[in-house]
Regions:
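A late-sequence structural motif
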Residues: 68, 218-257
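Flexible hinge/capping segments at coil-to-helix
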Residues: 116-155, 243
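Short loop->beta-strand "edge-of-pocket" segments that line small-molecule binding or catalytic clefts
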Residues: 57-59, 129-130, 145-165, 253-254
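Alpha-helical linker/hinge and terminal dimerization helices associated
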Residues: 11-12, 33-55
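Central regulatory/effector-binding core of bacterial HTH transcription factors
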Residues: 54-117
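A short LG(V/I)-centered, amphipathic sequence patch enriched
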Residues: 7-26
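Secondary-structure junction motif
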Residues: 154-175, 239-247, 255-257
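Hydrophobic hinge/microswitch elements
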Residues: 92-97, 101-105, 110-111, 163-217
C-alpha cells in the first residue's frame, strides 16, 4: 500500500498522507482530492457495467417511488425479453437530485427539477393535488375546495424538499400560503395524522387512492393545483438512445396521451 501511495504522490506532486505518532492522517489536499477520486472510481465502475452488465440505476422521489412507479417497473421487466435489471432507489427529492448529479443514477423521476446542461428532462405526468380530511371533518362533504377557502386552513406538513412549498407559493400568489401545522416528515405519517383527526393536508391524489376507496379518508379536488412530475436522464454521448427504462416511461406517457 505504501508503495502505491508513494507512486500516487509522485504522480500528483503533493503529499497526500501525513504521518505522526498517533498514526497517519490525510492532508488537506488529500481531502480536497478524495471526492474527485471517488467520482473517477465510480465512473470506471459504471463504464465496466455498461460493457458487461445491463442494470439501470433509477432514482425516484419518495412519493413517486412509493405510490406511482412500481407498476411501471413491473411492466418494464415482464413485457419484453432480454431486459436488464432496474435498481430502484427511493429517496427524498433533494437526495435524488444529488445522486443524479454525482453520477450515481442513470435516470430519475422527481417532483421538481432545475434544468441542467448535462441532462435531458421531460414531463412524465401531471398529478393533481388533493386536500385530505377525515370522514367526520366539517369539510368532508364540501366537494371541491376553492383557493380562497383553502388559504385559511392550517396544513399538516409532509416530506421536506418535495417542492410542494414552492408550488403553493406560486398557486396562492398574493393570498399567501396556508399556515403550517405539524411537520411530520412523510406522506404516510400525514395520512395517519389526518385519519386521527389531527388536521388536514395536501397530497398527490395517487397517494391516497386506497384510503379513499376504503372510506378511511376523503380527498377533495382543488382546481388548478397539480404537480408536474419530471423524468430526467443524463445526456447520452453521440446519438445513443436514453436508458431502456426511460424509453419505456416515455412510450407509456405517449400512449396515455
Amino acid at each position: 500500500v505504501s508503495q502505491h501511495l508513494q507512486k500516487l504522490e509522485e504522480q500528483v506532486g503533493v503529499t497526500l498522507v501525513q504521518g505522526s505518532r498517533s498514526g497517519c492522517q490525510p492532508t488537506t489536499r488529500a481531502l480536497a482530492f478524495m471526492p474527485h477520486a471517488t467520482a473517477l472510481l465510480d465512473m470506471h465502475a459504471r463504464a465496466l457495467e455498461a460493457l458487461h452488465g445491463n442494470r439501470e440505476r433509477v432514482g425516484a422521489s419518495s412519493n413517486i417511488g412509493t405510490y406511482l412507479l412500481q407498476p411501471f417497473v413491473r411492466n418494464y421487466l415482464t413485457t419484453a425479453n432480454e431486459r436488464g435489471e432496474v435498481d430502484l432507489r427511493i429517496a427524498a427529492n433533494p437526495d435524488v437530485a444529488d445522486q443524479l448529479l454525482a453520477g450515481q443514477l442513470d435516470a430519475a423521476i422527481m417532483e421538481w427539477w432545475l434544468p441542467h446542461p448535462d441532462f435531458e428532462h421531460r414531463l412524465w405526468r401531471v398529478e393533481p393535488l388533493v386536500l385530505i380530511v377525515s370522514p367526520d371533518h366539517a369539510l368532508a362533504e364540501a366537494g371541491c375546495i376553492e383557493r380562497d377557502r383553502l388559504v385559511d386552513l392550517p396544513m399538516l406538513g409532509g416530506e421536506p424538499g418535495s417542492g410542494t412549498g414552492r408550488l403553493l407559493t406560486e398557486y396562492f400568489g398574493e393570498l399567501g400560503v396556508p399556515r403550517s401545522g405539524m411537520q411530520l416528515g412523510s406522506t404516510e405519517a400525514v395520512k395517519q395524522a389526518v385519519r386521527a383527526g389531527l388536521g388536514v393536508s395536501l397530497v398527490m391524489a395517487s397517494a391516497v387512492q386506497d384510503e379513499v376507496r376504503s372510506g378511511a379518508l376523503v380527498a377533495l379536488p382543488i382546481p388548478g393545483l397539480e404537480k408536474r412530475l419530471q423524468l430526467i436522464w443524463r445526456k447520452p454521448p453521440g446519438n445513443l438512445h436514453p436508458p431502456g427504462f426511460v424509453r419505456h416511461l416515455l412510450e407509456e406517457a405517449d400512449l396515455a396521451g
